[in-house]
Amino acid sequence: MIPVYDYLVLGVILFGLSLVGIMLNRKNIILLLVCVELMLLAVNTNFIAFSHYYNEVGGQVFVFFILTVAAAEAAIGLAIVMLLYRNRGNIDVDKMNHLKG
């Protein structure tokens, strides 16, 4: 059986990679969305590890809610990105600071 420490280290590594990805890729909004999804995956990994370690089902149920919210976030985020690309011709985050009235 794999100890819970290994799962927590995996969660920390995934969270750290996503945090570095968010810091380094400030221009591309699609990469920002992917990094946020990776961050949610890291949190889910920790919830599953603690849920299995303490023999509680609550953490696993909470993961399903997080996955549902993450899927909705990804769908809405990609729809907004497609509309921005269609209207403006690029998906550069720096050029999205102008709002139309």
Curated annotation (Swiss-Prot):
The keyword Translocase applies. GO terms for cellular component: NADH dehydrogenase complex; plasma membrane. It is a multi-pass membrane protein. GO terms for molecular function: NADH:ubiquinone reductase (non-electrogenic) activity; quinone binding. GO terms for biological process: ATP synthesis coupled electron transport. It is found in: Cell inner membrane. It catalyses: a quinone + NADH + 5 H(+)(in) = a quinol + NAD(+) + 4 H(+)(out). Its main location: membrane. Keywords: Cell inner membrane, Cell membrane, Membrane, NAD, Quinone, Translocase, Transmembrane, Transmembrane helix, Transport, Ubiquinone. It is an enzyme of class 7 (translocase). The chain crosses the membrane at residues 4-24, 29-49, 61-81. It comes from the Bacteria. Its EC number is 7.1.1.-. NDH-1 shuttles electrons from NADH, via FMN and iron-sulfur (Fe-S) centers, to quinones in the respiratory chain. The immediate electron acceptor for the enzyme in this species is believed to be ubiquinone. Couples the redox reaction to proton translocation (for every two electrons transferred, four hydrogen ions are translocated across the cytoplasmic membrane), and thus conserves the redox energy in a proton gradient. PANTHER family: NADH DEHYDROGENASE SUBUNIT 4L-RELATED (PTHR11434:SF21), NADH-UBIQUINONE OXIDOREDUCTASE SUBUNIT ND4L (PTHR11434). Belongs to the complex I subunit 4L family. NDH-1 is composed of 14 different subunits. Subunits NuoA, H, J, K, L, M, N constitute the membrane sector of the complex. NCBIfam families: PRK05715.1-2, PRK05715.1-3, PRK05715.1-5. This is NADH-quinone oxidoreductase subunit K. It comes from Legionella pneumophila subsp. pneumophila (strain Philadelphia 1 / ATCC 33152 / DSM 7513). The lineage of its organism: Bacteria, Pseudomonadati, Pseudomonadota, Gammaproteobacteria, Legionellales.
